[in-house]
Amino acid sequence: MKKTMFDKIWHQHVITGEPGEPQLIYVDLQLLHEVTSPQAFEGLREKNRQVRRPDRNFATMDHNVPTVDIFNIKDLISKKQIETLAKNTKDFGIRLAGMGSKDQGIVHVIGPQLGLTQPGMVIVCGDSHTATHGAFGSIAFGIGTSEVEHVLATQTIWQTKPKTIGIHVHGKLSIGVYAKDIIMGIIAREGVSFGTGYAVEFYGDTIRNMNMEERMTLCNMVIEGGAKMGSIQPDQTTFDYIADRKYAPGNMEKAVSYWKQFYTDSPDAFDKVIDFSVNELAPFVSWGTNPGMAVPIDQPFPKIKNEEDKKAYEYVGLKAGEKANQIPIKFVFFGSCTNGRLSDLIIAAKVLKNKHIKNGITALVVPGSRKIKEKAEKIGLDKIFKEAGCEWREPGCSACLGMNPDRVPAGIHCASTSNRNFAGRQGAGSRTHLASPAMVAAAAIHGRFIDIRKEII
């Protein structure tokens, strides 16, 4: 019987349970942050339990951290959560990339960056965008706080095995079109619930030609299409990325030999297959209040089909038939676990080099980790951003979500490289428009979205 990569990894991790029912599976790595872990640790204390495998857990601080004056946390709840994580990890013997640590950053950025994320693993975190790690050929998914506690106590989790979707991505991307446009295009076409109840695997020549950071962008946003998990078969690109990282296997040759078993035998093994050609794909921009409400830059916003569309247009202050180049951009955000990596910053910097953002625009550049910030500064990216009028910040989740000081004011349209454009996501009343780093950089210069393909050419 033909099997998917997902089937093979799942089978190796099942401890007990019948097919079709919840099964107890082993967890290779749990990533922790300050927001969804406090109650989990408190639960352990109340039951007088220890962490089963401290070495299989790793924590960082990202959601609430300020990106200016990082040790001066003014919000009392945020400060308490960060202090609590520091105490909990110390008390239970878990590694922590704390405030100011050279390893600190967004949890879904530092996992791969440190070599913690590896093929064939089951990886969990109390955060929905845990699917990012599936880009390495792993099963990775977000869990709730009670499940975080269960994993801490047992290094296992109860899960019902989902069905699988294979998304065949093929063709050659045009200049100015990126991985972000692919996943936004898929969600815009298939809807925000196409993946509900499924684990997604991306495959095809377009995927094979991507670097790891592009692959992570795809898997990161598959959750916005309803899927709990997204993955990509590991290959030499994967192995080369992991080699020599801090927590990479000591014997890479042996590890690679093991990792090579994780592949899908045939597309026939998937429960469902979606075909997606990128040959004619254009840059995408979101117009509404979910990632599926997005259009190619050269197409008008759609007609109102239902009450959800009507409410979305009212919230963002736009009208059906208008185009993305009519959105008055006053705020831009470069960062997040979707597009806050070094290659993303390089792309944005190329657009901004020797240019200046439009007067009246606030532009935040927030590297996904301290290591990325240091690497960017070594090649002069910080100077390019600052000379263009942007603010160069410390690492963190920042303006992706309104849980820290970096918030978009009410009524303001923000061009953002993040992953969600829900009402109030970037701050109460904020209006978020998702796009690639190149598109956001161009919007910062012009004060509106333009077709970056024409700008580059």
Swiss-Prot record:
Cofactor: [4Fe-4S] cluster
GO molecular function list: 3-isopropylmalate dehydratase activity; 4 iron, 4 sulfur cluster binding; metal ion binding
Entry similarity comment: Belongs to the aconitase/IPM isomerase family. LeuC type 1 subfamily.
Pathway given in the UniProt record: Amino-acid biosynthesis; L-leucine biosynthesis; L-leucine from 3-methyl-2-oxobutanoate: step 2/4
Function: Catalyzes the isomerization between 2-isopropylmalate and 3-isopropylmalate, via the formation of 2-isopropylmaleate.
Domain of life: Bacteria
Binding note for cofactor: Binds 1 [4Fe-4S] cluster per subunit.
Pfam families linked to this entry: Aconitase
Xref: PROSITE patterns: ACONITASE_2
Gene name in the database record: leuC
Keyword field contains Amino-acid biosynthesis: yes
InterPro entries, per the entry: 3-IsopropMal_deHydase_lsu, Acnase/IPM_dHydase_lsu_aba_1/3, Acoase/IPM_deHydtase_lsu_aba, Aconitase_4Fe-4S_BS, Aconitase_4Fe-4S_dom, IPM_dehydratase_rel_enz, IPMI_cat
Catalytic activity reported: (2R,3S)-3-isopropylmalate = (2S)-2-isopropylmalate
Organism phylogeny: Bacteria, Bacillati, Bacillota, Bacilli, Lactobacillales
Keywords: 4Fe-4S, Amino-acid biosynthesis, Branched-chain amino acid biosynthesis, Iron, Iron-sulfur, Leucine biosynthesis, Lyase, Metal-binding
Assigned EC number: 4.2.1.33
Binding site for [4Fe-4S] cluster: C337, C397, C400
UniProt name for this protein: 3-isopropylmalate dehydratase large subunit
Subunit organization: Heterodimer of LeuC and LeuD.
Biological processes per GO annotation: L-leucine biosynthetic process
PANTHER family: 3-ISOPROPYLMALATE DEHYDRATASE, HOMOACONITASE, MITOCHONDRIAL-RELATED
